[in-house]
Amino acid sequence: MNLLKSKGVALLGLVALASTGALGSEGDVDYRHYSMEAIGGHMQAIVKILRQEVPHNEQLSLHANAIADMARIAPDLFPKGSQGREALPAIWEQPEDFAEHLDAFHSAAEAFKKAAASGDAATIGSAIGGLGQSCKGCHDSYREE
């Protein structure tokens, strides 16, 4: 019975912390960080494939699809109260401009996804350039290095 009571007290404590935002904010910051690292990992894998450093051309679309999926959820990675790590305060101070950058990222990711599926080298090359520029544009304004 004591074990059950202590688990109940611990659960109530977690609920109380979550309702004050103490867990949510830190959790959101970590979630955003790892999500962005995942995007970066897919980009690095794509570069290896395009430079023919690895024999995995058939996996290009897999990585392109993953980035497009992550771009779709990118706005959810920056809820109010989740300031921290590399995210600059300008994200929440200039929400309209930041949203435009996220829209550009999503559009570029979708274009690269289509290009990767086409298999056309010129289209892929152009689309990866656009995707890289969309990442850079946002990072230059909204990410602390």
Each language-model region and where it sits:
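Hydrophobic alpha-helical segments, especially transmembrane helices
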Residues: 6-8, 33, 140
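The canonical Cys-X-X-Cys-His
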Residues: 131-143
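N-terminal signal peptide c-region/cleavage motif recognized by signal peptidases
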Residues: 17-21
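Extracytoplasmic c-type cytochrome modules immediately beyond a signal peptide or single-pass transmembrane anchor
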Residues: 25-130
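Bacterial N-terminal signal peptides that target proteins for export
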Residues: 1-11
